[in-house]
A protein has these predicted regions:
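Domain-length cofactor-binding catalytic modules of enzymes
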Residues: 1-165
């Protein structure tokens, strides 16, 4: 759950920003819901609710667009959709196979902290952590296209800056 501090942080750098609505959703949770005439627990792991007319967000990678969406309430998906583009490669694979140069090119024009040393263990230890690089994720446009029966895209958001905290 957000506390409102993120609004203060954004307003500090962009004072003219006007927050109309906050979209705050979870992507790993279980909820008691009614589906097919029965009360059931729906466990959404990397997914989020997409009930009829419910507003949500499907984020892309730090270098790709994100989408504000409206749920279509598709019962076949238990009224769910993906929460994000999803990984194309594991964190370790990204940090051991991608190069800083290609990751920097993918982030060209987007304000962000550049890559830090990997804090994990094994093959990636001591290398730069490229695990969140855009190339590690699926193409958000393909993801949105594949979910047209689950959500209606309302707004396409293009990243200007990427903050990690």
């Amino acid at each position: 759950m957000r506390t409102g501090h993120e609004r203060v942080g954004v307003a500090e750098f962009v004072p003219e920003v006007n927050f109309i609505r906050t979209i705050d959703i979870h992507h790993n949770y279980a909820a008691c819901e009614e589906h097919f005439g029965k009360k059931v627990f729906v466990h959404r792991k990397g997914a989020t609710s997409a009930k009829l007319d419910e507003i949500g967000i499907i984020p892309g990678s730090m270098g790709a667009a994100s989408y504000i969406v409206r749920g279509l309430g598709n019962p076949d998906s238990f009224m769910s959709c993906s929460h994000g583009a999803g990984r194309r490669m594991s964190r370790i694979a990204a940090s051991t196979t991608l190069t800083v140069e290609e990751c920097d090119r993918a982030m060209d024009g987007i304000v962000c902290e550049r890559w830090h040393k990997y804090k994990g263990y094994g093959k990636a230890k001591g290398k730069l952590d490229l695990s969140e690089a855009p190339q590690a994720y699926k193409d958000i446009e393909d993801v949105i296209a594949s979910e047209r029966d689950l959500v209606e895209p309302l707004v396409r958001l293009v990243p200007l800056a990427s903050l990690k905290g």
